[in-house]
Amino acid sequence: MNKIAELISRLCPDGVEFKTLDSLVSYVQPGPYIVSSTEYDAHYSTPVLTAGQSFILGYTNEEEGIYNASSQKPVIIFDDFTTSFHWVDFDFKVKSSALKILKIKDKQKADFRYIYMAMKTIHFIPTNHMRHWISLYSKFEIPLPPLNIQKEIVSFLDSFTSLIDKMKQEVEMRKKQMVYYIDKFYGGDFDGMMRLADIPGNSVVQFSDLGPIIRGKRFVRDDIRTVGQPCIHYGDMYTYYGTMAVTAKTFLERDFPKKMRYAHKGDVVIVGAGENDYDIGVGLVWMGEEPAAVHDACYILKHHQIPMYISYYLRSNIYHQQLKKYVSSGKISSFSAEGLGKVYIPIQPEDKQRQIASILDTFETYISKLEKMIELRQKQYEYYREKLLTFE
């Protein structure tokens, strides 16, 4: 950081010049690289990209029309409508024509990675559904210091991204380990789960045998407040909550929820509707001292087991393989309380349940700490990126 400041002071005493993006990069139309079939498979070799949030949509086995990018010849794929973009340094195909493939014009004048980072400081939000690169976005200016300063800035910022990437890789590795142990603890597969019943003290029962399965009551986003009666909305089960919650993200007015149905401390809340067949059915243990009103796209399970033992089971492949038989697929997938009640779960002695929950808690705590560290490093990266690339 000090080295960069010294270079800027010495080489740019009168400030830094600004250049338009179209003076620094050219674009290639994506037409020749559009995938013919959307029959993707993870076993295929060529990724199919979008410039949107999803980035990699899947993998194709098509051999023609592959764009050859590499660490030596990287590109930026730019969404012409949303203006989101991604750095790409591997071979790929694209999903649609609604993007541009950006390339560096002159490596002697500008570092392409620097341009990519500088583009991240352009805080433009599209308001019209139109193509933006040619008519507008390419005319935006970015600061362009001497090439050696660009490279120093890239090196400094990439040290953050490299650390963040390594931490993300560890999170993914730990999550895979956790999934492995979850399945192992509950039998490995359906037959293995059934064999657990042969162990003295164990049994395999259906969810309906655990206790009442109660559907929540309807409320909408407009009913939600920042204070009041705790409530659990089904959408937040996917985006906010984990396997357990002590406090709620949202609330209802105190006089609103007289007709609501509640999760009490130790109850398991299971989401019964979603946009895909796999995530549906995950759940959390409500551990708040105050009851939480539950949305009607969720179910409340009353039971007499170790709560986290059930919550972790809801993350197992064994559970989801059974549940999908009772899921009605459509624009929104869903299942009934009756369907959930038919799913089997291995019941082990209480001390064994506690032991399993404790081991999995250790994984989850470690993963949570890593994710918080990633968030902190990401904020540091964005702070330094803004500071360095605005030259203020």
Model regions and ranges:
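Amphipathic alpha-helical coiled-coil/heptad-repeat segments
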Residues: M1-T20, L144-G201, I347-E392
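Short, recurring structural edge motifs at helix starts
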Residues: A5-L11, Y33-T38, I125-H129, K139-P146, ...
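Non-catalytic DNA-recognition/assembly elements of restriction-modification systems
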Residues: I8-P32, H43-S54, L196-K217, M373
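Short, structured motif recognition centered on aromatic/hydrophobic residues
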Residues: V16-V25, V94, R113-Y116, V154-F160, ...
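Long compositionally biased, domain-poor regions of proteins
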Residues: D22, D89, K105, A110, ...
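DNA target-recognition patches
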Residues: D22-T60, K73-D80, R221-R254, H264
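A short beta-sheet element
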Residues: F55-A118, H233, K259-R315
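A short glycine-rich beta-alpha junction/loop motif
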Residues: K93-K100, N128-P146, P291-A297, S328-D351
